[in-house]
C-alpha cells in the first residue's frame, strides 16, 4: 500500500538501493535498505534514476561504490510501469521489455482454479505417512495422498503423507471450527503443487489425481491434463522464477503470487 501511494501521488526523483550489509553492526543479509527522494506531485513520464549498490559485499564499501559508480550500476526508469505490476514492486533492474509482459499477456489466473485448502484441525489424528496405513485403505479411498509441501524439489514428489478420507472424517473437516474441506469439484484432481515455504528456491511439482492438499502444499488446477503439464513447465522456467522472486521476495509463496505470473502466447497443443 505504501508503494502504491508513492507511485500514485508523488514522483520518485532518484533511489539508491543500498541493499544487503547496510549496517556495520549487522553486516549480513538480514536487513535491506534504500534511500530515495520524491517530488510531492505527479510528473508524468518523469525518468527517475536508480542506483544499485548491492555489488558492495561489506557495508564499509558502500560509500566508495556510490561515489565511483559506473554506468552499469545506474538505471533510468519511468515509474508508471511499476504501477502495472501486481503489488507495485520497484523492480528497476529488470528490462522494460520484461516488465511489459504483464501488459501484453494473460496470467496464470486466466487458466487456473483456486478455491482454498484443506485443514484437518487435528493432524495427529487425521494424517499419517503412507507406509503407516494398510495399502488397501488407500485403494479404497479411506486414506488418500496429501500434498503438504516439504523440501525443495521440482517436477514430482514430496507426497508421502495420507489424510483420513472416510465419510466421518470429511464431516469433521466440514463442521469443525478450525478444519476446512475444499469444494467437492476439486477432489482427486491433478494439478500443480508447490511448497508454501520456499527457503532454498522455488520448485513446482505435478499433483497426481486421486489426492488432495493443504496450504503447505498449495495447489492450482486447470481445465485439462495437457494444460497442467504446460503450466508446470512454464512455472519451472527461469523467467517465471525471476518474476515470482520480485512479486514476493519473502519465503512464503502465496497462491495469488503464482496466479499473477504472465503466460506467454504459445500453442498449448504443442507445449510440454
Predicted regions and their residues:
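Residues immediately flanking
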Residues: 40, 149, 196-197, 222
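Signature of N6-adenine DNA methyltransferases within the class I
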Residues: 1-137, 158, 168, 172-175, ...
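Short Ser/Thr-interspersed hydrophobic loop/turn segments at strand-loop and sheet-helix junctions
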Residues: 147, 185-203, 231-245
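Contiguous C-terminal substrate-recognition/catalytic subdomains in enzyme active sites
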Residues: 132-185, 193
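Short beta-turn/strand-loop junction motif enriched in small, turn-promoting residues
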Residues: 20-23, 152, 199
Amino acid at each position: 500500500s505504501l508503494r502504491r501511494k508513492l507511485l500514485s501521488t508523488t514522483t520518485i526523483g532518484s533511489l539508491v538501493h543500498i541493499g544487503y550489509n547496510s549496517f556495520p553492526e549487522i553486516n549480513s543479509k538480514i536487513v535491506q535498505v534504500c534511500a530515495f527522494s520524491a517530488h510531492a506531485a505527479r510528473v508524468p513520464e518523469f525518468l527517475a534514476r536508480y542506483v544499485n549498490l548491492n555489488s558492495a559485499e561489506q557495508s564499509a564499501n558502500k560509500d566508495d561504490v556510490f561515489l565511483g559508480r559506473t554506468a552499469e550500476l545506474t538505471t533510468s526508469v519511468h515509474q508508471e510501469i511499476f504501477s502495472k505490476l501486481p503489488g507495485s514492486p520497484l523492480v528497476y533492474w529488470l528490462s522494460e521489455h520484461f516488465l511489459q509482459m504483464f501488459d501484453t499477456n494473460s496470467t496464470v489466473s486466466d487458466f487456473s482454479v483456486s478455491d482454498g485448502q484443506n485443514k484437518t484441525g487435528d493432524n495427529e489424528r487425521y494424517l499419517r505417512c503412507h507406509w503407516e496405513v494398510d495399502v488397501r485403505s488407500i485403494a479404497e479411498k479411506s486414506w488418500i495422498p496429501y500434498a503438504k509441501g516439504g523440501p525443495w524439489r521440482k517436477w514430482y514428489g514430496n507426497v508421502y503423507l495420507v489424510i483420513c478420507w472416510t465419510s466421518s472424517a470429511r464431516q469433521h473437516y466440514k463442521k469443525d471450527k478450525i478444519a476446512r474441506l475444499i469444494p467437492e469439484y476439486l477432489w482427486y484432481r491433478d494439478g500443480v503443487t508447490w511448497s508454501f515455504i520456499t527457503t532454498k528456491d522455488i520448485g513446482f511439482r505435478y499433483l497426481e489425481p486421486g489426492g488432495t492438499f493443504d496450504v503447505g502444499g498449495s495447489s492450482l488446477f486447470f481445465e485439462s491434463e495437457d494444460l497442467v503439464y504446460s503450466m508446470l513447465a512454464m512455472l519451472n522456467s527461469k523467467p517465471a522464477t525471476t518474476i515470482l522472486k520480485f512479486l514476493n521476495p519473502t519465503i512464503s509463496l502465496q497462491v495469488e503470487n503464482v496466479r499473477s505470473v504472465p503466460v506467454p502466447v504459445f500453442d498449448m497443443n504443442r507445449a510440454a
